[in-house]
Amino acid sequence: MTNLNWQPDLAQQRGPLYRAIADALASDIRAGRLPVGTRLPTHRDLAWNLKVTVGTVTRAYAEAERRGLISGEVGRGTYVRPTSTITDPALKGEPLGPDFVDLCLNRPQTGEEPALVAKGLREIAESPDLEALLQYQPHAGRAIDRAAGARWIARSGLKTSPAQVLVTQSGQNAVASVLSAVTQPGDTVAVESLTYPGVRSAASLLSLRLAPVAMDEHGLLPEAVAALCRGGSVKALYTLPTLHNPTATVLPLERRLALAEIARAHGVALVEDDVYGFLLKDGPPPLAGLAPERSFYITSTSKSMAPGLRIGYVHVPEEAHDRVAAALRATIYMATPLMAALATRWIEDGTADRLVEQKRAEIVARQKLAREMLAGSRLSGHPAAPHLLLWLPEGWRAEAFEAAARRDGVGVTAATAFWLGRSNPPNAVRLCLGTPVRRAEVVRGLERIAALLKRPPEADLSVI
């Protein structure tokens, strides 16, 4: 869709003119007057219509792009992009009925973790380390915790050392800290066209521009990354190459090798988010091992152990250590010592390995269940992934399906929440199979989804 005649109503807007234009643009997008994929007027045309300078419109579009409202590409134009976010009712504090099945947020299934946390905290409370754990620690983490982090990272096949590992307050904190260390405000970061929404939040906080890169059924396309890098403006590539969220693709080795060479050729930092990699046995080597001099490898305990631990680990090139440590100091000062100590105990005594094996086995079983119960539907995923994409039949829109599913007592997430591309987002929803505590809840949720797929979309035309 094209709306080259769009002219904002600035009468109700306040502040600098460029910001007023960006605010009006946001208002028209929210109101539905500018749907996703709408092509906007050129800088010059809008400046002529508004009787302002081209520089003012350029600043307005840059501000709108920083907010995640639009994306532009030289030679193609400027387009409205999706701005949906994951709307997990549990995180929003919405009251959930006892029969509601939440498949919205990627969380590992819970088993013996509460009892293990209670036991571990009792042991820490009775240990001689307790007093020290209540004090300030090094910004990068205690030596013992960095050593445990290095051991945990080494499970992926990446060679590292405690000197190259920093302890963070979750994988999300690691993403923001690394991006802060390798970019400046206004820089461009390449990402998959479908990507983890947390990187959008980090980019907005740091005033970074996200440039979506095309994918196929195997993941990121190296030739698309190379084409983007040839423009000379890309400072970093953020990617989830193993059990990608939300597509669950595993990037083949040959593409990883190609990305490493492209990054070297163009001086691009590689930010590898591997929070799901623990679920895959014998997967391809991490990107960080293929281009170690420019790679940042991120993992955490949120998916492998428990989200409430909020402990992450990041492997960095030695020369970048102090910059990432400075970002941690500026944001969290240090990861919570008590939780870091608990994670270290679990890594050292084998508890973490046992939890991983339990989660692997359960996810494989739940994936098999989903494919049996949704047989006949188009599904994208991997047998080891905690999530999958359900592609919707003709007539359904992803947002309408999400709303209808919620009314039927099951939470799913429209692919719009992950989409940064310039065209219409994939007409699919993500199902997170690890969230329900019991497998019987997964069955109940999948039954409701299967029943909804059999209903004609016309029955839900009340969803706007």
Predicted regions and their residues:
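Short hydrophobic/aromatic beta-strand micro-patches
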Residues: 315, 389-391, 432-434
